[in-house]
């Protein structure tokens, strides 16, 4: 009974307080403080979440970095199927072989002339080309360069710049990187022009080169301008498809097309062709 009286008194006091002017002043304050408390609570919760999100992002970034590092290590351990031109350039830098600018500048084009033959099967035609060039200018020397022979000499000389690379590639049965043959030819021509032989006006006849348009462009960038690309009509038509794989045949024909597009291709005929020797002599005189 006494407890009920106290509860009743408290309810009456509360009702009286709520309807009093003082309560009207206190209530907004209580409401506002409660609302502010909720906002502070959300900010605290957000602040707690931010470090977690940041931590997760850091972990993801570290995971990707670790995966990239491991995969790159694995790729480096994988045996190379072939060497790219950029990798060959890196090899030159690592071995101390400095790449130089163009060997024969434009002001020397009249002194040193380059005649390239992408494919030749019958070497007797080389002699005819030499004879024709000798007729047009007897004072000029003719030098025949065989890249296959240069590569063989480079491999056999253990002290040569590219000997180790050539032997390693051959041992692993890997193709030569783009630019390697041109670099060996450049090395040889550089040797020739810096000897007594280099004082003479010279025609350089390079056989079975270039066999890709990339090598052709590289030659003119690194060595000198090509005067003529000689296309051996009979050999290209009959021997080339029988002697080399289809891909190499296509590459050599692309070389012919490239030089034809810049008006440097000259078709040479032989006595084995349908055309007669008289027409052949006319063609040779145009060199």
Swiss-Prot record:
Record has Transmembrane helix as a keyword: yes
Location within or outside the cell: Mitochondrion membrane
Gene Ontology, cellular component aspect: mitochondrial membrane
Signal peptide (residue range): none
Primary site of residence: mitochondrion
Superkingdom to which the source organism belongs: Eukaryota
Keywords on record: Membrane, Mitochondrion, Transit peptide, Transmembrane, Transmembrane helix
Bilayer-spanning residue ranges: 55-72
Topology relative to the membrane: Single-pass membrane protein
Transit peptide region: 1-14
Family statement: Belongs to the AIM36 family.
Protein name: Altered inheritance of mitochondria protein 36, mitochondrial
Lineage of origin: Eukaryota, Fungi, Dikarya, Ascomycota, Saccharomycotina
């Amino acid at each position: 009974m006494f407890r009920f009286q106290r509860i009743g008194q408290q309810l009456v006091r509360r009702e009286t307080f709520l309807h009093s002017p003082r309560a009207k002043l206190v209530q907004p304050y209580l409401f506002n403080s409660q609302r502010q408390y909720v906002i502070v609570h959300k900010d605290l919760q957000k602040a707690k979440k931010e470090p977690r999100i940041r931590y997760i992002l850091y972990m993801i970034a570290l995971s990707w970095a670790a995966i990239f590092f491991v995969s790159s290590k694995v790729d480096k351990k994988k045996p190379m199927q072939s060497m790219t031109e950029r990798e060959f350039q890196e090899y030159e830098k690592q071995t101390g072989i400095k790449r130089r600018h163009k060997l024969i500048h434009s002001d020397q084009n009249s002194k040193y002339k380059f005649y390239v033959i992408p494919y030749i099967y019958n070497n007797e035609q080389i002699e005819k080309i030499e004879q024709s060039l000798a007729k047009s200018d007897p004072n000029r020397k003719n030098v025949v360069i065989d890249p296959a022979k240069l590569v063989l000499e480079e491999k056999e000389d253990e002290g040569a710049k590219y000997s180790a690379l050539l032997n390693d590639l051959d041992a692993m049965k890997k193709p030569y990187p783009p630019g390697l043959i041109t670099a060996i030819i450049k090395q040889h021509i550089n040797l020739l022009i810096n000897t007594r032989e280099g004082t003479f006006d010279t025609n350089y006849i390079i056989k079975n080169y270039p066999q890709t348009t990339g090598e052709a462009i590289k030659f003119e960038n690194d060595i000198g301008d090509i005067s003529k690309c000689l296309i051996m009509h009979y050999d290209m038509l009959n021997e080339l498809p029988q002697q080399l794989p289809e891909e190499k045949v296509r590459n050599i024909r692309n070389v012919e097309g490239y030089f034809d597009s810049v008006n440097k291709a000259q078709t040479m005929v032989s006595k084995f062709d349908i055309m007669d020797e008289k027409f052949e002599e006319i063609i040779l005189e145009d060199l």
